[in-house]
Amino acid sequence: MFRLQLFLFLILLIPNLHSDSFSIMNLNAQNLFDTLDDEGKDDKAFLPLKSKESFDHINSCHNINVKAWRMECLYLDWNEETKEAKLANLVKNIISYQGNGADIIALQEIENENILEQLFSLLKPYGYIDFVLLEGTDKRGIDTAFISRFQMNNPQLHYVNFSPEFEKKDTRPILEVSILFNEQNIRIYNVHFPSNFNDLQMRIESFNLLKELHISHSDASIALGDFNLNSKDDKRESVYKNQEDQWFVAHREGCQSCNGSYYYGYGKSWDFLDTIFVSRGRGIAFDKDSINVLKTDFNTYKDSGKPHRFDPKTKKGVSDHFPMVARINLN
């Protein structure tokens, strides 16, 4: 009986190669760092306290203008226990989707391949076989990444060539991989567009690059990630609507009762900073009923319904973003 139960469990974890659909998840992990000082990257807040005692470290923290970030740099104890709790909570969040996680996971705010591999090792028992992260030039050292039950091929980064007034600003590239599903090549783009501290035009130019990448080939494509587009800007400029000549946009196709993936405290608004795009007319489409914002009792504040960001002191919470999930059909 035990062997039969184990066999059935393993079958659930392995993607059905003859299926006509697969699931996908986007999750901004909110500062998934290891405990080591990654040379050349600004990871000084995410170190153990014992590594924060030097004059140089303390002085560099005092140069941070935002008080909350300055206090984090000085006093956050990002030790092994804290890191392991963060990883465990992320795994719990990921596998809460249908009991074993989505077939493909797109992640943002991952420091490096070292911490990604640690997360992958914890997810490997659930049938995941591959992970990808390519180091970008973001000064904070946070990158986009994938973990997948499918082999991923041809990983590459695409940088935005911004207008002259923005070209000196730091940005993150678009990460592209390909999978072969039912003998069909599918390209997947993972994005983390410039934050709302930057001009909206930088995000619009990032959307334009994504569109250029999409029309440069005829493969079925998915784009997902943290687009950093708040509802105020989207309403004023119709940014998501303007993508619909090329893409189906998840929260405009389904998830009608969803508030958003992120609560923007400054504007006091729910926003779909995170969403999923599926290419039009290229043989794939959303299962519209599957589109959802993944909320659980441990990733949500009970009183407000907002995302429960990870608290290093209590070791509770996951991220300040909710995951976005959907099932993709071949048609």
Where are these regions (language model features)?
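Solvent-exposed loop/turn segments at secondary-structure junctions
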Residues: 29-33, 110-114, 136-140, 151-153, ...
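Metal-dependent phosphoester-hydrolase catalytic domains
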Residues: 23, 212-222, 229-331
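Active-site beta-strand/loop signature of hydrolases that rely on acidic residues for catalysis
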Residues: 24-29, 73-79, 83, 90, ...
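Classical Sec-dependent N-terminal signal peptides that target proteins to the secretory pathway
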Residues: 1-19
